[in-house]
């Protein structure tokens, strides 16, 4: 199980990303709009740089919802491979069956 501090840090980042999503999207639209003047685009770039670092979605890490494990996480389930196997064998993950061919 991951340290609780790491799990809490990731949750804090998710909240910041959600909080600044609209502002970040608006600034990104200004920055990529080539019809605007260079000064306007530069000002938007400065405002983007002034946003909190953790408000960027690229800093998020997918973690297992049960254990907090950062690696081997399946997006479809939000669980790490260990927990998927464990829960699937117990029949607790709907739609997952052992492969047979």
Curated annotation (Swiss-Prot):
GO terms for cellular component: cytoplasm; small ribosomal subunit. Gene3D superfamilies: 1.10.287.1480. Signal peptide: none annotated. PANTHER family: 30S RIBOSOMAL PROTEIN S14, SMALL RIBOSOMAL SUBUNIT PROTEIN US14M. The lineage of its organism: Bacteria, Pseudomonadati, Pseudomonadota, Betaproteobacteria, Rhodocyclales. One of its GO terms (molecular function) is structural constituent of ribosome. Binds 16S rRNA, required for the assembly of 30S particles and may also be responsible for determining the conformation of the 16S rRNA at the A site. This is Small ribosomal subunit protein uS14. Belongs to the universal ribosomal protein uS14 family. Part of the 30S ribosomal subunit. Contacts proteins S3 and S10. The keyword ATP-binding does not apply. The keyword Cytoplasm does not apply. Pfam families: Ribosomal_S14 (PF00253). One of its GO terms (biological process) is translation. The gene is rpsN. Keywords: Ribonucleoprotein, Ribosomal protein, RNA-binding, rRNA-binding. SUPFAM superfamilies: Glucocorticoid receptor-like (DNA-binding domain).
């Amino acid at each position: 199980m991951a340290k609780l501090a790491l799990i809490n840090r990731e949750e804090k980042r998710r909240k910041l990303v959600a909080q600044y999503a609209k502002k970040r999207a608006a600034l990104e639209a200004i920055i990529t709009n080539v019809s605007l003047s260079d000064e306007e685009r530069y000002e938007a770039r400065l405002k983007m740089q002034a946003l909190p670092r953790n408000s960027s979605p690229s800093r998020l890490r997918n973690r297992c919802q049960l254990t907090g494990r950062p690696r081997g996480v399946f997006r479809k389930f939000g669980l790490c491979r260990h927990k998927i196997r464990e829960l699937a064998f117990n029949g607790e993950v709907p739609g997952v069956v052992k492969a047979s061919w």
